[in-house]
């Protein structure tokens, strides 16, 4: 019989539970989530249904134990041995009993046999009987992540039925029925880890067995996760077709954009593969792809394919009639709900009290550390997996990019705050694994201890954090003084926390024989410098005002030293660039005038094309940094007096230097780089537009920004609006020129336009182009 213990919710609140399904009365009354209890105790000697035929009235069990609803009327019965040996395993991966079970599983999967449930009717005998639970198809995914338990091994000669199938039955894929039906040994494995979900046991022991869908899996795999059967592409359902379309769109669109500064493709290639088995990743990808798809819809494929004929997976039926915004909201809400539930079971209360579970995967322990939950928890009815820390990081990065698509400031900041906290927490666990007394190859001291997934997520979050701080005129969340964190991400710094030249072999920028492409490291180094520059700009606008020339002198001298230090590091970075960061082709303005028919003003700029997209985008960011650096140079002295002529000459020289960098930013965009470069060029183009005064040049910047949003769906209208308002303030007479260029901002937030301090350069050498 079952020992009724009540649901977990009532047990935690110390309430009496009536165990009503699916929600007990106490939980329904208080509007709480009713979580069934996984604890089941079998006491067959106390059940009246176990009385044998020869049992007398004195020996038989009384009516007190004869529960009417102990077993269902349709329960199936099979003979089991009276003597059962329970074996307690301490190591699931090395225990001989489990290894033997794996062999049996492999044998049964290699030679599947047809199976029909109605054949079990002939197995019922008059001896001792016990009902065997059957696994319903709806609970197969919930039973997958189990890991611990008891093995039953006993010779059973009675289980040798003749298994046959009807002639008309068709088996579409290999099916393995329960092990007890094919082997003389019963191998019952019920696994339960402290970080996995326990399925509902009531339905587990009552629902009929779906033999056509059930397939047992080996339990000795390093990562205990259920692998769903691969469906036939010809019988995809509508939802599966939609998911397939969104997965491919993400790989060619947002995922490819996130991989711009990564050698190879991680988000575009590896993450969709993981999403096949990870519902959390799948819904996150679907939400991001649906949002991007809703903003472009009737466009040709993002990359590859044909514009005249598309694959069936890409062609979604009735695209104009589909409410993609609603689908985006559904996928997003599902992802956030699953993410919060996963985080509640993953993150410990404090770094000192947290537990770190080290699971070796592919020989690299750094790839698979997990923060274990304090107690078993059922995540949800549709969640049958325990996501790893890396998978949670990837999901958070995708959600941040989801908000970055249309620059939803409030939600974007929330995700960035969570991403920063989770990155730091995971990095602390990486640090804790580096024990000083473990001098072995498994615990290296280099930054390679961090996994590729962690690095890919870190640099994506670092770029978004820098851009969010630039847009909102605030400081970044990531601390540039935490050198250990940045070194974990691969940044090469010397003892003085300064960058090293990328082409100086004496500094060991790349280890000998290392196959890593250094362009990725160079691009990431510029992100670190940009973070320092944005923080420098944010601090300069909030300096507390104190009376006294002495205090003002200290503040200005300190900021002046910081500015020169930043300028020196940018110069070191630029002087060490390899040839790959130079334009592979450049077209002078005189050669482009005859080719442009509709927009003759485009011939005012030289076009520069880079063969490596990451280098093109990085150079645009560098030119943007030089503009910001010049415009935020502090005064050398607050008491120094200059004539108006010198001041005017100085401002003109600064504007000329900034316009040189602005034209280079525009020239790279005019060369029509791929969409990944274009979506990352919004902020450089906006910065360049602030330095322009010619109406024709301004029109080009507006056209480039609008084309980015129309072609990719990336939000640029808020920057267009800010540029138009700024140009109207500078030239009130030109309001008619920009009247047709104004566009409404669909966001509720008003984005602050960066304001820069007036700068002064000492001599003309500061104005040279870097």
UniProtKB/Swiss-Prot annotation:
Gene clusters encoding host-selective toxins (HSTs) are localized on conditionally dispensable chromosomes (CDCs), also called supernumerary chromosomes, where they are present in multiple copies. The CDCs are not essential for saprophytic growth but controls host-selective pathogenicity. GO terms for molecular function: DNA-binding transcription factor activity, RNA polymerase II-specific; transcription cis-regulatory region binding; zinc ion binding. It is found in: Nucleus. Transcription factor that regulates the expression of the gene clusters that mediate the biosynthesis of AM-toxins, host-selective toxins (HSTs) causing Alternaria blotch on apple, a worldwide distributed disease. AM-toxins have two target sites for affecting susceptible apple cells; they cause invagination of the plasma membrane and electrolyte loss and chloroplast disorganization. Residues 7-34 bind DNA. InterPro entries: Fun_TF, Zn2-C6_fun-type_DNA-bd_sf, Zn2Cys6_DnaBD. One of its GO terms (biological process) is positive regulation of transcription by RNA polymerase II. Keywords: DNA-binding, Metal-binding, Nucleus, Transcription, Transcription regulation, Virulence, Zinc. Its main location: nucleus. It comes from the Eukaryota. Induction: Expression is up-regulated more than 10 fold in toxin producing cultures. This is Transcription activator AMTR1. GO terms for cellular component: nucleus.
């Amino acid at each position: 019989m079952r020992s009724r213990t009540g649901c977990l919710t009532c047990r935690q609140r110390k309430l009496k539970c009536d165990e009503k399904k699916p929600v007990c009365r106490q939980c329904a009354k208080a509007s709480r989530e009713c979580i069934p209890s996984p604890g089941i105790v079998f006491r067959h000697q106390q059940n009246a249904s176990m009385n044998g035929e020869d049992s007398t009235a004195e020996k038989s069990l009384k009516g007190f134990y004869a529960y009417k609803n102990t077993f269902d009327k349709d329960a199936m019965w099979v003979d089991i041995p009276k003597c059962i040996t329970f074996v307690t395993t301490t190591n699931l991966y090395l225990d001989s009993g489990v290894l033997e079970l794996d062999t049996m599983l492999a044998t049964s999967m290699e030679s599947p046999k047809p199976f029909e449930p109605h054949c079990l009717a002939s197995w019922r005998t008059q001896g001792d009987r016990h009902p065997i639970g059957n696994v319903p198809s709806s609970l197969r995914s919930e039973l997958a992540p189990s890991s611990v338990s008891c093995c039953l091994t006993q010779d059973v000669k009675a289980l040798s039925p003749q298994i046959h199938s009807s002639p008309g039955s068709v088996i579409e894929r290999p099916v393995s029925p329960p092990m007890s039906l094919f082997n003389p040994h019963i191998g019952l494995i019920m696994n339960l880890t402290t970080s996995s979900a326990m399925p509902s046991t009531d339905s587990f022991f009552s629902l009929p067995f779906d033999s056509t869908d059930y397939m047992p899996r080996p339990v000795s795999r390093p990562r205990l996760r259920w692998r769903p059967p691969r469906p036939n592409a010809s019988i995809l359902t509508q939802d599966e077709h939609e998911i397939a379309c969104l997965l491919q769109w993400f790989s060619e669109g947002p995922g490819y954009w996130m991989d711009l500064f990564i050698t190879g493709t991680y988000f575009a290639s590896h993450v969709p593969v993981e999403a096949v088995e990870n519902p959390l990743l799948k819904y996150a990808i679907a939400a991001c792809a649906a949002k991007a798809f809703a903003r472009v819809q009737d466009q040709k494929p993002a990359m590859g394919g044909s514009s005249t004929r598309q694959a069936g997976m890409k062609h979604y039926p009735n695209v104009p009639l589909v409410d993609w915004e609603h689908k985006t909201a559904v996928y997003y809400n599902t992802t956030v709900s699953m993410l919060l539930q996963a985080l509640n079971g993953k993150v410990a209360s404090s770094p000192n009290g947290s537990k770190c579970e080290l699971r070796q995967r592919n020989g690299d322990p750094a790839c698979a550390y997990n923060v274990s939950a304090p107690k078993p928890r059922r995540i949800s009815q549709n969640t049958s997996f325990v996501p790893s820390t890396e998978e949670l990081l990837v999901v958070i990065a995708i959600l941040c990019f989801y908000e970055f698509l249309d620059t939803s400031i409030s939600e974007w900041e929330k995700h960035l705050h969570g991403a920063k906290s989770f990155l730091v927490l995971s990095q602390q666990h990486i640090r804790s694994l580096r024990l000083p007394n473990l001098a072995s190859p498994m615990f290296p001291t280099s930054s390679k201890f961090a996994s590729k997934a962690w690095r890919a997520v870190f640099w994506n979050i670092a770029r978004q954090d820098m851009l969010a701080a630039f847009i909102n005129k605030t400081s970044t969340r990531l601390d540039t003084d935490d050198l250990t964190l940045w070194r974990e991400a691969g940044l090469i710094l010397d003892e003085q926390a300064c960058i090293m030249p990328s082409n100086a072999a004496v500094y060991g920028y790349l280890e000998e024989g290392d196959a890593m492409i250094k362009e990725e490291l160079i691009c990431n180094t510029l992100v670190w410098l940009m973070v320092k520059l944005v923080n420098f700009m944010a601090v300069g606008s909030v300096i507390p005002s104190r009376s006294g020339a002495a205090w003002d002198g200290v503040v200005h001298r300190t900021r002046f030293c910081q500015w020169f230090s930043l300028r020196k590091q940018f110069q070191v970075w630029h002087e060490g660039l390899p040839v790959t960061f130079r334009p592979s082709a450049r077209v002078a303005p005189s050669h482009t005038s005859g080719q442009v028919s509709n927009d003759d003003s485009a011939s005012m700029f030289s076009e520069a094309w880079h063969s490596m997209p990451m280098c093109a985008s990085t150079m645009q960011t560098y030119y943007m940094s030089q503009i910001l650096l010049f415009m935020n140079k502090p005064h050398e002295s607050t008491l120094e007096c200059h004539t108006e002529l010198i001041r005017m000459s100085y401002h003109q020289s600064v504007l000329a230097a900034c316009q040189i960098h602005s034209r280079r930013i525009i020239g790279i965009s005019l060369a029509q780089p791929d969409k990944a470069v274009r979506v990352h060029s919004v902020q450089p183009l906006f910065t360049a537009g602030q330095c322009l005064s010619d109406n024709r040049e301004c029109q080009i910047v507006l056209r480039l920004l609008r084309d980015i949003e129309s072609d990719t769906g990336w939000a640029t209208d808020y920057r267009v609006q800010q540029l138009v308002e700024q140009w109207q303030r500078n030239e009130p007479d030109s309001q008619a020129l920009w009247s047709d260029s104004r566009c409404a901002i669909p966001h509720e937030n008003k984005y602050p336009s960066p304001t820069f301090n007036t700068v002064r350069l000492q001599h003309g050498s500061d104005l040279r182009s870097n």
